[in-house]
């Protein structure tokens, strides 16, 4: 029986994000293109039969354990069985910024669902895990599925796609963005015409955009300044509601040249876009 497992929890980018309408329940209808990065957090799960319960090895600063998506994911999974389950201690090695639009919390939740499904030998299928994930957050299912995808609805209706696996410079301006503030903004575009799946990743990338970007640029000058700087070298875009932005480059060396010249005070990283999640690659190796 497997008692310990260490797994990656990759970042995602929204290569574009269009808001195509608003539902009666107030949620926005989206069309977006998700792609993973070969960069992210790392989670270690250790079963503790002698110590029941679900716990973090160390608290995440600023996030109560009861609100942490890792704890919530493990508890949601445990609720699917009446069997007595061994306890687990979870160590989170964070590299992704919180609230950056990179899906860090959602990715952590998905990694937890897949890891604990295996450690607890629950044998739930991917569809069941994605359904649990959706209750935790709209971005969790794409991490559970593990393939780049065209997302619709609130982002949960997924069609696998294979956009080019380019290199990215990802920058994190020094500000924290409220997603609720962006989606409730008066000037937010909410009527972008729907596109079909095939054109979602073909042709000129500048034809597509992030509908949140104009509002974010107006409300957060730090993001605007970073986008202006990165746009000197090619199309630059917001991911999610930010604050992270990204620029696409054909090679690692081209990306690193730009990275080395970034303004002081801005954090971030260089990473490769990948269509098959590093999490799922690792799980396949462990079979």
From Swiss-Prot:
Disulfide bonds: none annotated. GO terms for biological process: isopentenyl diphosphate biosynthetic process, methylerythritol 4-phosphate pathway; terpenoid biosynthetic process. Pathway: Isoprenoid biosynthesis; isopentenyl diphosphate biosynthesis via DXP pathway; isopentenyl diphosphate from 1-deoxy-D-xylulose 5-phosphate: step 3/6. Transmembrane segments: none annotated. SUPFAM superfamilies: GHMP Kinase, C-terminal domain, Ribosomal protein S5 domain 2-like. The active site is at residues 12, 139. ATP binds at residues 97-107. One of its GO terms (molecular function) is 4-(cytidine 5'-diphospho)-2-C-methyl-D-erythritol kinase activity. Gene3D superfamilies: 3.30.230.10, GHMP kinase, C-terminal domain (3.30.70.890). It is an enzyme of class 2 (transferase). Keywords: ATP-binding, Isoprene biosynthesis, Kinase, Nucleotide-binding, Transferase. Its EC number is 2.7.1.148. It catalyses: 4-CDP-2-C-methyl-D-erythritol + ATP = 4-CDP-2-C-methyl-D-erythritol 2-phosphate + ADP + H(+). InterPro entries: GHMP_kinase_C_dom, GHMP_kinase_C_sf, GHMP_kinase_N_dom, IspE, Ribosomal_Su5_D2-typ_SF, Ribsml_uS5_D2-typ_fold_subgr. It comes from the Bacteria. PANTHER family: 4-DIPHOSPHOCYTIDYL-2-C-METHYL-D-ERYTHRITOL KINASE, CHLOROPLASTIC. Catalyzes the phosphorylation of the position 2 hydroxy group of 4-diphosphocytidyl-2C-methyl-D-erythritol. Belongs to the GHMP kinase family. IspE subfamily. This is 4-diphosphocytidyl-2-C-methyl-D-erythritol kinase. It comes from Marinobacter nauticus (strain ATCC 700491 / DSM 11845 / VT8) (Marinobacter aquaeolei).
